[in-house]
């Protein structure tokens, strides 16, 4: 190869590398558009509750994987099932795109009076495999929600058919058990598909 050919080859290589970097930057957004990322992750507060199999769990259940945590209840008429369907669809889409890791979907009951472990298992299993349901003593749930800034309140009623007002946010918990980010809604599949790889990749 003569000097002129060598210079041309170097120039072509640099142009190709620059084009590849530009394409990658166009394909992989650097900042989330829909999630609010906390400046520093907040540790999940200590708690003692039950999973959907009735086994005792504590805050360490959030260690070792990414979690999408929603606070709701199985008798919720619309917001809860709709949000969980969105999370399930987003997780499926991310899996089809080859996203690793995939987040786990977690439902924490704000109606433990009715949400037994058995009922929680039926409910979370409806939205896919590997989901986690959490229920238990009301004071422990209140400890968890208060520490994460989640609101809920039971409507006063004399019967068993009552509603529970609650925050509709979805929390992103990192593998270290830290509250990393927040999706406040509206909950749209595309929003999660866009932002989750960025949030999970930035920890």
Annotate each language-model stretch with its function.
Residues 1-46, 202-203:
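N-terminal targeting signals for export/organelle localization
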Residues 51-52, 174:
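Short, acidic, Ser/Thr-enriched surface-loop or helix-capping motifs
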Residues 57-58, 180:
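Generic structural signal for well-ordered beta-strand positions
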Residues 59-83, 87:
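Short active-site neighborhood of thiol/selenol oxidoreductases, capturing the structured segment around
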Residues 65, 84-107:
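Conserved helix-turn-beta segment immediately C-terminal to the redox Cys motif
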Residues 100-115, 130-139:
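Thiol-based oxidoreductase modules, predominantly thioredoxin-like and allied folds used
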Residues 121-167:
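Short, internal strand/loop/helix patches
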Residues 158-203:
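Thiol-/selenol-based redox modules, centered on thioredoxin-like
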């Amino acid at each position: 190869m003569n000097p002129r050919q060598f210079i041309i080859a170097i120039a072509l290589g640099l142009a190709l590398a620059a084009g590849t970097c530009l394409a990658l930057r166009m394909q992989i957004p650097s900042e989330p558009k829909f999630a609010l990322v906390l400046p520093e992750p907040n540790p999940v507060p200590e708690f003692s509750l039950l999973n959907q199999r009735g086994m005792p769990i504590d805050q360490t259940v959030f260690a070792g994987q990414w979690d999408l945590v929603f606070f709701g209840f199985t008798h919720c008429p619309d917001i809860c099932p709709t949000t969980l369907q969105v999370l399930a669809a987003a997780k499926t889409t991310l899996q089809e795109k080859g996203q690793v890791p995939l987040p786990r979907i977690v439902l924490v009951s704000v109606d433990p009076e009715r949400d037994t472990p058995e009922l929680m298992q039926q409910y979370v299993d409806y939205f896919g495999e590997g989901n986690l349901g959490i229920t238990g003593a009301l004071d422990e749930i209140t400890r968890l929600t208060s520490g994460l800034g989640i609101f809920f309140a039971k409507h006063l009623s004399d019967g068993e058919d009552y509603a529970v007002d609650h925050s509709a946010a979805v929390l992103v918990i990192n593998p270290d058990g830290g509250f990393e980010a927040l999706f406040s809604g509206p909950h749209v599949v595309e929003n999660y598909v866009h932002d989750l790889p960025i949030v999970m990749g930035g920890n």
